[in-house]
Design a protein with these regions (language model features):
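Active-site-proximal betaalpha loop/short-helix elements
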Residues: 90, 184-259
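Helix N-cap motif at beta-to-alpha junctions
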Residues: 266-272
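Short, acidic (Asp/Glu-rich) active-site segment that either coordinates a divalent metal cofactor
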Residues: 142-197
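Extreme N-terminal cap/leader segments of soluble proteins
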Residues: 1-55, 105-106, 110, 313-319
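Acidic, Ser/Thr/Pro-rich beta/coil linker or hinge segments at domain junctions
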Residues: 279-319
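General beta-strand structural signal in soluble alpha/beta enzymes
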Residues: 27-29, 47-48, 113-116, 154-156, ...
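Small-aliphatic-rich amphipathic alpha-helix that forms the alpha element of a beta-alpha
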Residues: 56-81, 98-111, 195-199, 215-221
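Glycine-rich anion-binding loops of enzyme active sites
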Residues: 77-166
Length: 319
């Protein structure tokens, strides 16, 4: 079944097998954590790797955003990328499209593609693109740093990545006007969280960029890794009109679908208002959507408690 491994399998077969220990590894592989923190002299290097295996039409652009977001959400300043592109055939037009997207998005975000690997692989039915991103950080910020009393902030809105994917890979399923469809496609230009992460990193107790499972899935990962309850007001979670329309067309919940473009952050209650004002000054939409409480690891929303990872609603469209 499409999607992330369950926690038990991940823990048993992946997270327990990490090779030789190294004292310079400050933060290694763990559930819900998307980047490693490595001591390099007096500096902290943040490194992350992430594949794009389902979305097809904007795979190169999406890959750059997803990989760099993981570094930014961990407090790093994304700088270099390593790119692996696997193709089902040697179609030069397909490769041209992917590498042009990688090049354009990297240049737009100020990132350098420093190396990588490209080959044709028998048995694939679509291209795969996996990027590794690295950058230095003044302060590492984990997914699981939330503390009781913190406030939960969300930038931009839910389902931004899903909006773009639906408007390209699944446009034939959307009953949208040409204007609304064009607006939905522009979601791909709003996927980077580097600007807001730079604002929040100095004070955030935890940060996470929601991807699979959407904003709700990201919140669950923050709650489980921090061993806290996160109480969320669904009505406070911003959903753009084009996102709502696209999700309604395929009957998926905007809070449970591909969420790149949003950044979740927990901050001390005394810092929340100031951070929202600073983000607004930078032209970044952000709202407070909840609070962190003592209790079993869970997300409380809509009179329900979510204690397990969320399966992304988009997966059913590919399965």
């Amino acid at each position: 079944m499409t999607g992330k491994l369950d926690r038990e399998t991940l823990s048993t077969l992946v997270l327990s097998r990490t090779g030789a220990p190294n004292p310079d590894l400050l933060a290694g592989p763990a559930f819900g954590e998307d980047a490693a923190a490595i001591r390099v002299g007096d500096e902290t290097l943040i490194a992350s790797t992430d594949p794009i295996s389902l979305a097809a039409e904007r795979i190169g652009q999406l890959a750059v955003a997803v990989a760099s977001n993981d570094v930014a959400a961990s407090g790093g300043r994304p700088e270099f990328l390593l790119s692996t592109v696997l193709l089902p055939d040697a179609d030069p037009d397909r490769l041209d499209t992917i590498t042009a997207q990688l090049d354009a998005e990297s240049e737009r975000l100020g990132l350098t593609v420093a190396g990588g690997h490209t080959e044709v692989v028998a048995g694939l039915d679509r291209p795969l693109c996996s990027l590794t991103c690295v950058g230095l950080a003044d302060r590492y910020v984990s997914t699981g740093g939330a503390r009781p009393g913190d406030r939960v902030l969300l930038t931009k809105g839910a389902g931004i990545e899903a909006t773009g994917v639906l408007a390209t890979d699944f446009r034939d399923r959307l009953d949208l006007s040409a204007t609304d469809l064009d607006r939905a496609v522009t979601a791909f230009d709003d996927l980077s969280v580097m600007p807001e992460a730079a604002v929040l990193a100095p004070v955030a107790t935890g940060m996470h960029d929601p991807t699979e499972g959407g904003v709700l899935g990201g919140l669950v990962e923050m709650a489980l890794t921090a061993d806290v309850t996160v109480a969320v007001d669904r009505d406070a979670v911003h959903v753009r009109p084009e996102t709502r329309a696209a999700c309604d067309a395929v009957d998926v919940d905007p809070l449970r679908v591909l969420g790149s473009g949003a950044l979740l952050a927990t901050v001390d209650a005394d810092d929340a208002e100031g951070m929202l004002e600073t983000l607004d000054d930078e032209g970044i939409d952000a709202v407070e959507i909840g609070r962190v409480e003592r209790g079993e690891p869970a997300v409380a929303i809509d009179y329900e408690r979510h204690t397990e990872p969320i399966r992304d609603g988009m997966y059913a469209l590919w399965d």
